[in-house]
Amino acid sequence: MARSDELQDALDIPVPDDPSLVLDGCRRLLGPNLYGPSPGAVGDALIAGHVPRQVLHAWTGLARRMLAALGWHEAEVRGRTFAGGANLYVPAEVDQLFTAAYLIEAAWAITAHDLLGLAAMPVKPMEEQLRRIAAAEANPPLRDLVATAARKGIDRLLDDDAVTLGHGCGAVTWDSSALPDAPDWTHIHDIPLALVTGTNGKTTTTRLIAAMGQAAGRVAGLSSTEFVRVGDEILDRGDYSGPAGARLLLRDPRLELAVLEVARGGILRRGLPVTRAQAAVVTNVAADHLGQYGIMTVAELAEVKLSVHRALMPGGLLILNADDPAVVRASTHLAVPIAWFSLSPDTAQIAAARDQGAACGWFENGRIVLSDGRNITDLIGVAEVPLTLGGAARYNIENALGAALAARALGLPDAPIRAALSRFRSDPTDNPGRANEFSVKGARVFVDFAHNPHSIAAVT
């Protein structure tokens, strides 16, 4: 098995330099992603002066031919077009992701040469090169270990040089080139795990769930756009809302409960880092960071955010904002358990959930109310939740609802959920950069990280 640094430049593919057909990037996806539940690779093409759908058709055809040459007969290529371009995704085994990326690039180069009227690139020599790379990259022990973990219901974390089975206090990590023949599974296990995504409110909701875990006496940790923390210890500061943050957190042996803030960029660049979360929250979806990786509209962005459902374990709960039209529209095709939350008990999704005996949460008469599908619980009044500023910060009522439903899905009792809500504050200690209030020369000054029109509207 070749190491990742040896595979980075294993094949030099002559991609045409023409502004009308540009391969803007090709990257490996280490876990579930926008396109499907499996790891793989995806390429982004920028197309001008050609019909994107026709270009994608030709690109897909070459990719399928090369997959057949590799013997990957079960790999289902997926493509999508967007305004001014196309994406092509190829699923692959965990030890064939470089090969999949090279295949996408090779198929693009041959397609572009043809469409631009350049000298034809021979296909068979390229297929031989791909077979060589596939053989060099192959790591049967890694593939077998990951497959066995999946059969046992145990999650995995992957990077270029290591593999981890389980989470936190139940995790074991090996170098990918020195895997055990027969690992001792006795103490390998997952821990309660939630994902949080959305345009705004991700970090606050992530911090809230972790605070609920701590209130329940667990060693709770989180990864976020600002830091990775286990208990009260910050392991590192920076934007850790992608797979690197998840690995840093979930490999800590002290950890008993985890919350991952999952940003759009991490999902699109590397896929989701885990496969067996118990809960995933989508706070909302609004225009932000559009125009990257082929995501041009709010509707397309909603599809990216809701792809977190692919990282849920069987029976895991997807927790969605019923007051967000983009979230509601993007959820219609999903076949996973959904818990809706809303600022009104009369929202259609809340009414339907209550009729169907499904979990949900809502705001009514100044109270945060939860239902497990059988029993309704008056959890707490917003006057007792400092984060809501007496109910004025309605966006934080939504965040509290999503966090409470996630905490329940992680198996936490209502008492610590209620306790965390009553203690957690919008101050630089509990929630830095989020509606932090200061007194300056007799004036009340609020500092908030609001950075897009949706968040600015929410805090004004």
Question: How does the language model describe each region?
Answer:
Residues 230-340, 345-349, 384, 453-457:
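Flexible active-site lid/hinge loop adjacent to a nucleotide/diphosphate
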Residues 1-141, 147, 158, 162-168:
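Long, compositionally biased, glycine/small-hydrophobic-enriched stretches that function as flexible linkers
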Residues 162-166, 226-229, 365-375:
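Short polybasic amphipathic segments
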Residues 295-302, 306, 336-457:
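Adenine nucleotide phosphate-binding catalytic loops in nucleotide-utilizing enzymes
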Residues 145, 209, 213, 249, ...:
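Buried hydrophobic packing segments
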Residues 164-179:
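N-terminal pre-Walker A segment at the start of P-loop NTPase domains
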Residues 182-227:
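Walker A (P-loop) phosphate-binding motif
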